[in-house]
A protein has these predicted regions:
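Extended amphipathic ligand-handling, pore-lining, and cofactor/metal-binding catalytic surfaces
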Residues: 1-139, 144-229
């Protein structure tokens, strides 16, 4: 931001690459807005785009949850054909992941099951859901932007407590998707759309320039002018 100020840039648009409005997102947003409120840098606009999972699709707003589910299923479709997709999120107390499961259940992606490592829905609840669905072939997809080595080991490593091992122990045929959402071009497009929304919202709030209005003479003024001349 300091470099932008030195370059004479006074409008900045930031699109955080985050799934939910968690503590990291809020801290980043707070830090960025400090530059707007400081007279030292001269910014007139600092606008921050929303996380991937924000809008529920009510009152003519876009449905981020449905769009995210569609983007994931579309990207993994060749490998997920005739399989249930299990999304694993590294979440804690975020309601967005349970909302994502509800959106899937209500028709957006009925073959998708969501669980979190430290929150709700739990892995045990996902097992109950999978049992009711009756599908034995699964594709586990990390609901994370980066498919780190640690994450992939937790999902499909040779350790006895990996998600692969736990699901196989329950009698499922399991494949692991070895990419984060950040490599999904359809998810990338969703982030770009959020950035576009931030820009459009800023344009709507921008005060319209006043047009110069020429004075119009009334009849009485015209008559008075004629008498004077």
């Amino acid at each position: 931001m300091q470099d932008f100020a030195r370059m004479g840039i006074d409008e900045v648009y930031i699109q955080p690459i985050t799934l939910v409005a968690d503590q990291c997102y809020q801290q980043m947003r707070k830090q960025a807005l400090k530059f707007l409120h400081s007279n030292e840098y001269g910014f007139t606009q600092v606008n921050i785009g929303k996380p991937l999972l924000t809008s529920l699709g009510v009152k003519n707003y876009a449905d981020d949850y449905e769009a995210t589910l569609e983007s994931i299923v579309r990207h993994v479709n060749t490998k997920a054909l005739n399989k249930s997709v299990v999304l694993m999120a590294n979440g804690q107390n975020q309601l967005e992941f349970s909302t994502l499961q509800l959106k899937a259940m209500y028709g957006a992606a009925p073959n998708v099951v969501v669980f979190t490592t430290n929150g709700f829905p739990t892995f045990k609840q996902a097992l109950t859901f999978l049992d009711r669905m009756g599908h034995k072939d699964l594709l586990v997809v990390p609901l994370a932007l980066i498919g780190s080595t640690h994450l992939m080991d937790y999902l499909g490593g040779e350790r006895s407590d990996s998600i692969y091992a736990l699901l196989a122990e329950e009698g499922y045929n399991v494949d692991i998707w070895n990419e984060g959402l950040g490599e999904n071009p359809h998810v990338q497009d969703l982030f770009l759309k959020h950035l576009g929304q931030a820009i459009r919202m800023s344009d709507r709030k921008r005060p319209m320039p006043r047009e110069s209005v020429k004075p119009v003479m009334t009849n009485s003024r015209l008559e008075a002018q004629g008498l004077i001349s």
